[in-house]
Amino acid sequence: MSAVQKSSKSPRGRVSAGLLMFRRKTDEFEVLLVHPGGPFFAKKDEGAWTIPKGEAAPGEDLLMRAQIEFEEELGIQLSGDWIPLGWIKQKGGKIVHAWAFEGGLLEWFKLKSNMFELEWPPRSGKLKKFPEIDQAVFFSEELARRKINPAQVPFLDRLRAALNH
């Protein structure tokens, strides 16, 4: 594991940290991606999935934030040998730092996501609760490349390189 990385402000002030769980399948690997909940992503699939992640406060330990977010979003406590995947910049300017680790979900796994409130429908004055994530699925590397937010594809490339090293 590399030295502790701390959050700093990106150009738009948003920095996130996340974890990419993978499992080996013969000569390939599968990765766990999550689908954002709420009405804006309800009918979106390809390009909408993401690694489990969350925003870090300035100066916060990024790997610790990534672990906290993973546990909050998926209800899974974890530990592992972390593979640093570096960072990417998403379309909106957010910087995302990521680490990968090998793991799996138990048969009895049931998604337990945090909830958020949103005025829905817009300008209705009604607040409705939605899950932060509504699905968590293991995808083959090939399918993950189509499902994941395009800006996060380099994380898959870096994981592939680390596993082939």
List each model region and its residues:
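Non-DNA-binding regulatory cores of transcription-related proteins
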Residues: 128-134
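N-terminal strand-loop-strand
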Residues: 2-51, 99
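The catalytic Nudix box helix
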Residues: 50-85, 140
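Charged phosphate-binding loop/patch that engages nucleotide di/tri-phosphates or the phosphate backbone
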Residues: 137, 141-165
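Active-site-adjacent beta-strand/loop module that shapes the phosphate/pyrophosphate-binding cleft
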Residues: 87-125, 137, 159
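Short, solvent-exposed loop/turn elements at beta->coil junctions and helix N-caps
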Residues: 6-7, 84-90
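Short, charged/polar surface micro-motifs in flexible loops or helix N-caps
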Residues: 25-28, 38-41, 57-58, 92-93, ...
